[in-house]
Regions:
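Alpha-helical tetratricopeptide repeat
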Residues: 1-536
Length: 536
């Protein structure tokens, strides 16, 4: 037998394989007992491979791990799975992702709960752009690790977001436009006080009113798609509004600017931002149009940009609206909401203050100012400021007892402060004021879970929300999330799919797809490996 060379290690594959074999079989170099069985020889090859691996000599390591695999008795499944996983690690260093995935698959077949192999295969699938397979593997890892490893959870979150965006991009452009519920539409328009198109029709505009002697009003009304659209709006016959506005626009009628803005608004409401933008652009460019119309179009385009995660464009539009119509309270109200989303609380409060100065009766702005101050105090853990904000809420609901939003925001703050009983009372007041507002029932249902761990009552309230408004995507999303926590994945997936079909933006749809894909991955992992996360 030729003794193992003490000279430099050769780079060729043949020499490397020989080194492994000679090291294993040459008993002159083994000070202890001879390597009498295959497993010992396999372990020795693996150990030699580990030394090559640590030295950054990955090709040589691969040959040693291959030798270990060929020597290992097939019944030694745990050892064999380790050798495959080690070889996968070496392939990973060489960025041979297909080989990494193949070796990890062998390792997992031999040892189904082998976390290291599952995670390495997940990373290989990520590199190979196999998102679904990556998600299933990293989901199994998260469950096996009890959701304690930040690295695997970050990968799961990353791939879920990528899958969500990918699916939403395809689905959203082909979705059927869906008109929201009347309650949602009324709530939307109630956030504006300087919006001409949402104001009640003036005397002489309705078709059932007396005509003037000249017959001029009659002619305008009969030919005005915009005035018909306004009448349909008052009748809550929302599905006909876009087509009537289009008639006014096509005819280049007297109310063309108003019709463009109203049509754009309803395009936004049905989630068709691509159709809304040209109409908004046109209104903004009409220098001769009423400045209130142009400012309102800027507010709505700015809000649209924010929904599309374009904060710079959004900020530009709000600032332009403030420049052209500085006395418009809506500009400051909606810009304040934007500032909260951007975590610019002091600027948000300043905007709400300006809105209140211009419209002292604006209950919404006062309630949202209190909530902004509360969030700032809560985040900064400033107890005196928290108390001041809570006192502010009390003053708002006393001054504006008919403002449901005031009670709802106060309830959220009370929940944070674990004043659950009082929060529940606030939600009840919301329901008294707006019995058709499904969102309030969802929040009250979530409160029951947090407060009393009363799952049945919570689900009952969320089911009530769906009964009241079958288009409430928030209710379906919440129900799906609860079902995931209960381990009812099929029901959860059904709820998420219903929410997906109701999503009002591509970004919202992407988030819902992420939730749905997470539930689906857990279902697949349960089937393959018998793994389930802890449930409620």
């Amino acid at each position: 037998m030729v003794p193992f060379s003490s000279g430099p290690i050769l780079a060729s594959s043949a020499s490397t394989a020989a080194h492994c074999q000679h090291r294993i079989t040459d008993t002159h170099h083994v000070p202890h007992r001879p390597l009498v069985n295959s497993l010992d020889r396999a372990q020795a090859a693996k150990n030699k491979g580990n030394k090559y691996f640590k030295a950054g000599k990955y090709e040589q390591a691969i040959h040693c791990y291959t030798e270990a695999i060929s020597l290992c008795p097939t019944e030694k499944t745990v050892d064999l799975s380790t050798f495959y996983q080690n070889r996968a690690a070496a392939f990973e260093q060489l960025q041979k992702w297909k080989e990494v995935a193949q070796d990890c698959t062998k390792a997992v077949e031999l040892n189904p709960k082998y976390v290291k192999a599952l995670f390495r295969r997940a990373k290989a699938h990520e590199k190979l752009d196999n998102k679904k397979e990556c998600l299933e593997d990293v989901t199994a890892v998260c469950i096996l690790e009890g959701f304690q490893n930040q690295q695997s959870m970050l990968l799961a979150d990353k791939v879920l977001k990528l899958l969500g965006k990918e699916k939403a991009k395809e689905k959203y452009k082909n979705r059927e436009p869906l008109m929201p519920s009347p309650q949602f539409i009324k709530s939307y328009f109630s956030s504006f006080t300087d919006d001409i198109i949402s104001q009640p029709m003036l005397k002489g505009e309705k078709s059932d009113e007396d005509k003037d002697k000249e017959g001029e009003v009659l002619e305008v009304k009969e030919n005005s798609g915009y005035l018909k659209a306004k009448q349909y709006m008052e009748e809550e016959n929302y599905d006909k509004i876009i087509s009537e506005c289009s008639k006014e626009i096509d005819a280049q009628g007297k109310y063309m600017a108003e019709a463009l803005l109203l049509r754009a608004t309803f395009y936004l409401l049905i989630g068709n931002a691509n159709a809304a933008k040209p109409d908004l652009d046109k209104v903004i460019s009409l220098k001769e149009a009423n400045v209130k119309l142009r400012a309102n179009a800027l507010i709505k385009r700015g809000s649209m940009y924010m929904q599309q995660q374009q904060p710079l464009l959004s900020t530009q539009d709000f600032n332009m609206a403030a420049d052209i119509d500085p006395q418009n309270a809506d500009v400051y109200h909606h810009r304040g909401q934007l500032k909260i989303l951007l975590d610019q609380v002091e600027e948000a409060v300043a905007d709400f203050d300006e809105c209140i100065r211009l419209r002292p009766e604006s209950a919404l702005a006062q309630a949202q100012k209190c909530f902004a101050l509360y969030r700032q105090a809560y985040t900064g853990n400033n107890s005196s400021q928290i108390q001041a904000a809570m006192k502010g809420f009390e003053e708002v609901i006393k001054k504006f007892p008919r403002c449901a939003e005031g009670y709802a925001l106060y309830a959220q703050a009370l929940t944070d402060q674990q004043q659950f009983g009082k929060a529940d009372e606030m939600y009840d007041k919301c329901i008294d004021l707006e019995p058709d507002n499904a969102t309030t029932y969802v929040h009250k249902g979530l409160l029951q879970l947090q407060w009393k761990q009363d799952l049945d009552r919570g689900l009952e309230l969320i089911s009530k929300a769906i009964e009241i408004d079958s288009k409430c995507d928030f209710a379906y999303e919440t129900m799906g999330t609860i079902e995931v926590q209960r381990g009812n994945m099929e029901k959860a997936i059904d709820m998420f799919n219903k929410a997906i079909n109701l999503a009002k933006s591509e970004m919202e749809m992407a988030h819902l797809y992420s939730l749905c894909d997470a539930a689906h991955a857990q279902t697949e992992v349960a089937k393959k490996y018998g793994l389930k996360p802890p449930t409620l």
